[in-house]
Curated annotation (Swiss-Prot):
This is L-rhamnose mutarotase. It catalyses: alpha-L-rhamnose = beta-L-rhamnose. The active site is at H22. Substrate binds at Y18, Y41, W76, W77. Belongs to the rhamnose mutarotase family. One of its GO terms (cellular component) is cytoplasm. GO terms for molecular function: L-rhamnose mutarotase activity. It comes from Salmonella arizonae (strain ATCC BAA-731 / CDC346-86 / RSK2980). Involved in the anomeric conversion of L-rhamnose.
């Protein structure tokens, strides 16, 4: 498995709405993530800085990247763009993090 971590932001006035929309996520989105090899996907909120920290284990970069081109992912991004900064294609503004330590 490949471990990934990344950060995103959520609008200061949208913490509760962001959490509500993820509780639960759309079943179709969950199915696409799983079918594309995503496991142990978690998102954490830093309330004071409006930061979202996400971790996920993936089976391959190619399969993970393919999620973005699915219709359900495109609809999810559009659904979420009003609660977080988004790129012109509606994907969330994010930055990948470099792993510096792992204790198995």
């Amino acid at each position: 498995m490949i471990r990934k971590a990344f950060v995103m932001q959520v609008n200061a006035d949208a913490h509760e709405e962001y959490q509500r929309r993820h509780n639960p996520i759309w079943p179709e989105l969950e199915a696409v993530l799983k079918s594309h090899g995503a496991h142990h996907y978690a998102i954490y909120l830093d309330v004071e800085r409006n930061l979202l920290f996400a971790t996920v284990e993936i089976e391959s970069e190619a399969r993970w990247n393919a999620v973005a081109s699915t219709d359900i992912c495109q609809r999810w991004w559009k659904h979420m763009r009003d609660v977080m900064p988004a790129n012109p294609d509606n994907s969330p503004v994010s930055a990948e993090l470099k792993e510096v330590f792992w204790l198995a």
